[in-house]
């Protein structure tokens, strides 16, 4: 599987059986810039973090930088 990874937003190979994931959350600039986004690549299982929205997927390059409206 290939997953996008920030900061370069490049696609990299991940080990077999891993999932791609994207993290979004609000920081101190959320009201100005919108949610912060990290394309963290891949993990063996979908991680969970309190206060962070994590979306996981399991196909090549399925975690592109999300499009969203600016505040």
From Swiss-Prot:
Disulfide bonds: 3-20, 14-42, 26-30, 46-56, 57-62
Main localization, broad class: secreted
Gene3D superfamilies tied to this protein: CD59
Tissue expression summary: Expressed by the venom gland.
One term under GO cellular component: extracellular region
Superkingdom to which the source organism belongs: Eukaryota
Main function: Nicotinic acetylcholine receptor antagonist. Binds to muscle nicotinic acetylcholine receptor (nAChR) and inhibits acetylcholine from binding to the receptor, thereby impairing neuromuscular transmission. Produces peripheral paralysis by blocking neuromuscular transmission at the postsynaptic site. Induces concentration-dependent inhibition of indirect twitches and abolishes contractile responses of tissues to exogenous acetylcholine and carbachol, in the chick biventer cervicis nerve-muscle preparation at 100-300 nM (in vitro).
Family according to the record: Belongs to the three-finger toxin family. Long-chain subfamily. Type II alpha-neurotoxin sub-subfamily.
Protein's UniProt name: Alpha-elapitoxin-Nn3a
Organism: Naja naja (Indian cobra)
Source taxonomy: Eukaryota, Metazoa, Chordata, Craniata, Vertebrata
